[in-house]
């Protein structure tokens, strides 16, 4: 047997085994009518059932998001907020900003320079927006009854199995869970954390969701739930009041938009920095020639450099109701601005942060969940929701069962200089004001081709979301990888400060291993990059509409859930 034939057979066997493994784990599915990709397969199925009953993508997003808040409470929930980009088939493109806000009694100097106070505890909690955001989008576009969409999460709250990934998050915050009565009542038994597969009961949250299902957001913002929530926060030393909840408003905006290599990319406007930063990176890289200019170790170097430029610019962004960000956003979407930045990229070496022109220090947001949905009519939803860090403020409201966010940690705060000239000052555009929304990295994205939905993509993973979402996009639309391979490819991250590239090198709780190849790392180090392995990163959810050449011309939806968190998509 010839060597060529032997190699061909071996490659075929490897490809077959990889495909069989993927099918067995259901990381990727192909469906024609509708598809839902979330961090947790239970929530993907709940969303799919909504679609099968005649609901649309917006309906499914409500049910799936509420589900995620129950079974993945370390990442998101009704105690947090969300950014949602929607494309209505043949119609509007809308961005729903249901980001948490600073309480009315919040001040720029409320933490006195004590960063721990804004990281956890009652003073770290922002006014939650998720319930209002879900209801507002549903009110405008939903088809099924609101109660029908809330009920599955209510039933799950009565009893759900702890996943391996949730257990990992519990382990990472063990001491804080034990220190909070609400969290320990939920996740601790006989002094030990409950194990994966254990049934977890949150009857208070089930009742809260029942009230929200019956009465809508007024139960949360101006009813029994709100009164109890405000009381619990006050008891713990917080400053959120019922008036804060009553004052909360969802902001409906136009998505950011950029035409890149024949596709139209829709993203979230400020206070998200994700949409503008991702478009800037794509505009820079698109000028190198596709795919050769972004391939191999040199392509990775160029990606890192583009990210460093984008992170330098993004800290000039903030809540547009408090800071004029018009020119900054215009620059970040401008191909000319991208061309100017590309000219500063040196293919032979990297530079220290000052070279990239950033004036301000970075914020390091955390956590989140992401879901992507495309329905039968080809309406699309891309939603990233969050309570910020693992279990948010590391406190659970005992009377409502709600895990509260620590979104105030995403604000910059004035700090005394420590004399380190390598660390720039905090960004004034992101300082605290009453009613202001903090800067975010969340990057829910919808891709259009000739005015029709081509893809919905996004990721969870805090400040790394920008790089993670961009890399999945690059892999598919620039490097022509299939959707599953685009998600499975190992990722690398850079946030400008600290000046190091973090690369995946870890084995997940599901025994998948992700690692940037050593050959790539060697090339990057020769160019001056400081590399640091990380056990984690981002979790992507990706749905692509394909032409459907194998299904009689009817378009197909290829949906992929990232195996890094163990989720799987569902569709029909």
UniProtKB/Swiss-Prot annotation:
Keywords: Acyltransferase, Apoplast, Glycoprotein, Hydrolase, Secreted, Signal, Transferase. It comes from the Eukaryota. It catalyses: an N-terminal (5-L-glutamyl)-[peptide] + an alpha-amino acid = 5-L-glutamyl amino acid + an N-terminal L-alpha-aminoacyl-[peptide]; glutathione + H2O = L-cysteinylglycine + L-glutamate; an S-substituted glutathione + H2O = an S-substituted L-cysteinylglycine + L-glutamate. The keyword Cell membrane does not apply. Residues 1-22 form the signal peptide. Induction: By glutathione. L-glutamate binds at residues 99, 386, 388, 407, 410, 440-441, 461-462. Pfam families: G_glu_transpept. GO terms for cellular component: apoplast; plasmodesma. Expressed in embryo, roots and leaves. In mature plants, expression is restricted to vascular tissues of roots, leaves, flowers and siliques. Glycans are attached at residues 171, 222, 505. The active site is at residue 368. One of its GO terms (biological process) is glutathione catabolic process. Disulfide bonds: none annotated. It is found in: Secreted, Extracellular space, Apoplast. Pathway: Sulfur metabolism; glutathione metabolism. This is Glutathione hydrolase 1. The gene is GGT1.
């Amino acid at each position: 047997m010839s060597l060529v034939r032997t190699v061909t057979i071996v490659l075929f066997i490897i490809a077959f085994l990889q495909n069989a493994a993927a099918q067995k784990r259901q990381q990727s599915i192909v469906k024609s009518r509708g598809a839902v990709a979330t961090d947790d397969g239970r929530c993907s199925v709940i969303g799919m059932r909504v679609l099968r009953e005649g609901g649309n993508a917006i309906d499914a997003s409500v049910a799936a998001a509420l589900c995620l808040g129950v079974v993945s409470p370390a990442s998101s929930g009704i105690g947090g907020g969300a950014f949602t980009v929607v494309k209505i088939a043949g119609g509007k493109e809308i961005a729903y900003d249901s980001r948490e806000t600073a309480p009315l009694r919040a001040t720029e100097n409320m933490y006195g320079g004590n960063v721990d106070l804004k990281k956890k505890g009652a003073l770290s909690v922002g006014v939650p927006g998720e319930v209002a955001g879900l209801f507002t989008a549903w009110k405008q576009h939903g088809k099924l009854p609101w109660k029908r969409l809330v009920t599955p999460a209510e039933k799950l709250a009565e009893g759900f199995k702890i996943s391996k990934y949730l257990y990992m998050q519990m382990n990472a915050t063990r001491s804080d869970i034990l220190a909070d009565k609400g969290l320990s009542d939920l996740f601790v038994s006989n002094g030990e954390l409950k194990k994966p597969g254990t049934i977890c009961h949150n009857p208070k949250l089930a009742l809260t969701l029942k009230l929200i299902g019956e009465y809508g957001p007024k139960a949360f913002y101006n009813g029994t739930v709100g009164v109890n929530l405000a009381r619990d926060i006050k008891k713990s030393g917080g400053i959120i009041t019922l008036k804060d909840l009553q004052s909360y408003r969802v902001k409906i905006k136009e998505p950011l938009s950029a035409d890149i290599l024949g596709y139209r990319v829709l993203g979230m406007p400020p206070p998200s920095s994700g949409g503008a930063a991702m478009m800037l990176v794509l505009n820079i890289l698109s000028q190198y020639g596709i795919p050769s200019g972004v391939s191999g170790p040199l392509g990775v170097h160029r990606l890192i450099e583009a990210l460093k430029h984008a992170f330098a610019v993004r800290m000039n962004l903030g809540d547009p109701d408090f800071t004029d960000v018009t020119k900054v956003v215009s620059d970040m979407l401008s191909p000319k601005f991208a061309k100017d930045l590309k000219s500063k990229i040196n293919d032979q070496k990297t530079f220290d942060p000052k070279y990239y022109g950033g004036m301000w220090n970075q914020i390091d947001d955390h956590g989140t969940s992401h879901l992507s949905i495309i329905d039968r009519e080809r309406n699309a939803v891309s939603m990233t929701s969050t309570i910020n860090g693992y279990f948010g403020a590391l406190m659970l409201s005992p009377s409502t069962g709600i895990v509260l966010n620590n979104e105030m940690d995403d604000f910059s705060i004035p700090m005394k200089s420590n004399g380190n000239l390598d660390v720039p000052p905090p960004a004034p555009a992101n300082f605290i004001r009453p009613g202001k929304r903090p800067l975010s990295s969340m990057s829910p994205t919808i891709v259009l081709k000739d005015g029709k939905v081509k893809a919905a993509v996004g990721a969870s993973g805090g400040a790394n979301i920008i790089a993670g979402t961009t890399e999945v996009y690059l892999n598919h639309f620039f490097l022509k990888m299939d959707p599953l391979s685009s998600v499975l490819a190992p990722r690398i991250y850079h946030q400008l400060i600290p000046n190091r590239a973090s690369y995946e090198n870890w084995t997940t709780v599901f025994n998948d291993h992700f690692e940037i190849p050593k050959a790539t790392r060697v090339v990057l180090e020769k160019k001056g990059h400081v590399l640091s392995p990380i056990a984690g990163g981002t979790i992507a959810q990706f749905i692509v509409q394909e032409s459907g050449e194998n299904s009689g011309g009817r378009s197909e939806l290829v949906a992929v859930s990232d195996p890094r968190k163990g989720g799987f998509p569902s569709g029909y």
